Amino acid sequence: MSRIETDSLGPVEVPEDAYWGAQTQRSLINFAIGKERMPLAVLHALALIKKAAARVNDRNGDLPADIARLIEQAADEVLDGQHDDQFPLVVWQTGSGTQSNMNVNEVIAGRANELAGKGRGGKAPVHPNDHVNRSQSSNDCFPTAMHIAAAQAVHEKLLPAVTELSSGLAELSMRHHKLVKTGRTHMMDATPITFGQEVSAFVAQLDYAQRAIRATLPAVCELAQGGTAVGTGLNAPQGFAEAIAAELAALSGLPFITAPNKFAALAGHEPLTSLAGALKTLAVALMKIANDLRLLGSGPRAGLAEVRLPANEPGSSIMPGKVNPTQCEALSMLACQVLGNDAAIGFAASQGHLQLNVFKPVIIHNLLQSIELLADGCRNFQQHCVAGIEPDAEQMAAHLERGLMLVTALNPHIGYDKAAEIAKKAYSEGTTLREAALALKYLTNEQFDQWVRPENMLAPGGKG
């Protein structure tokens, strides 16, 4: 069953049970591309904008109070997720996001008209353009929704997840702050370090990434709304930009303000590319953490085997008993995806030709995917990997005992050249450092015990 809806191009058949109208239906017909739906976070942000605009237009006397109330009621239902099935459009549409903006306008108008007792859909008493989109353009609504959705996702999902992982790693670091092991540079044995110190680097990297993300948020909270079609604010009343930003801040609890330059807010997306860059920083840190833990857990008998990673599942369909570092692999893969998304976002953001960037949907699609992947990845990695990590103290001690770089502690006492000779002799003859040093008669057994003490090699000023 269907009904007829109309737009400036004429009549269109729309499913009878749909709240959307002609423009949404045309997009479904003309852009049957891929399966990537416009993110619900963007559509909910658009609904929030419609609610805020209705309130501001009502206060300004630009919208009848009864129409404003109907719009707000319908928008609240959208925000509550009651009509998520009414947003079928894909990312691959007009680059301004106009079709998704109209999808939201039509759904809110269609539901508002039903609430008014006039049946589902239609344009009376609530019109999708004249009322729901009053004082707005897709060109300022969509970038505003992009910023709202990104800011909400970072605040509500990403930052708590990064904090959870960072806290878990900090606890692991503190628990093993005295456990001495072999450090490694260039993938080769180096001077000693504690396992706690090693893990503390992970914590610091995550903290830096988190600070980088937070630093981008003030610009993300600057909104394009009020710029309308090209940034001039045509058809928006004086003060509308400031009023709707304040309304959106009150509704969301986030510090949204009006963007100081609406022309840049429509044509450029530097705040979002900055956020994407900070997400890349986090992805790079996560890749390093995952790779290090994967290396330290390699084995169990023919690798480093210095840490035991939790076994989440059997690791092989052919090798019985094999367990793989699957959490590390999943985290590494999502980090790769985030790096790729950053590249796509950067290219799309560079396409702001003249007064409007028309690559907006692909920017926000990739950005929100990165935020979601990083948030889910951090939380999952903490719960299913980090929380169950146990170092193998015996293996660490064995590697430390066999290591040759403890010879570095002898540099201040016998000089670099003699210390290097000891290490070379021990390596070539398969002996210990002690045996090589005594054979060369460069020091006594007592001096070796006094000077080669790993626990004294862990901080500035430390020496044997």
From Swiss-Prot:
Enzyme type, top EC level: lyase
GO terms assigned for molecular function: fumarate hydratase activity
A GO cellular component entry from the record: cytoplasm
Database matches in SUPFAM superfamilies: L-aspartase-like
Alphabetical keyword list: Cytoplasm, Lyase, Tricarboxylic acid cycle
Gene3D superfamilies for this protein: Fumarase/aspartase (C-terminal domain), Fumarase/aspartase (Central domain), Fumarase/aspartase (N-terminal domain)
PROSITE patterns named in the record: FUMARATE_LYASES
Binding-site residues for substrate, renumbered to this chain: 96-98, 127-130, 137-139, 185, 317, 322-324
Principal location class: cytoplasm
GO biological process, one term: tricarboxylic acid cycle
A Pfam family this chain is assigned to: Lyase_1
Active site: residue positions: 186, 316
Pathway this chain belongs to: Carbohydrate metabolism; tricarboxylic acid cycle; (S)-malate from fumarate: step 1/1
Cell location: Cytoplasm
EC number: 4.2.1.2
Record site: Important for catalytic activity: 329
Catalytic activity annotation: (S)-malate = fumarate + H2O
NCBIfam families assigned: fumC_II (TIGR00979), PRK12273.1 (NF008909), PRK12425.1 (NF009089)
Family to which the UniProt record says this protein belongs: Belongs to the class-II fumarase/aspartase family. Fumarase subfamily.
Reported function: Involved in the TCA cycle. Catalyzes the stereospecific interconversion of fumarate to L-malate.
Misc. comment: There are 2 substrate-binding sites: the catalytic A site, and the non-catalytic B site that may play a role in the transfer of substrate or product between the active site and the solvent. Alternatively, the B site may bind allosteric effectors.
Self-association state and partner proteins as the record states: Homotetramer.
Protein name: Fumarate hydratase class II
Originating species: Pseudomonas putida (strain ATCC 47054 / DSM 6125 / CFBP 8728 / NCIMB 11950 / KT2440)
Lineage: Bacteria, Pseudomonadati, Pseudomonadota, Gammaproteobacteria, Pseudomonadales
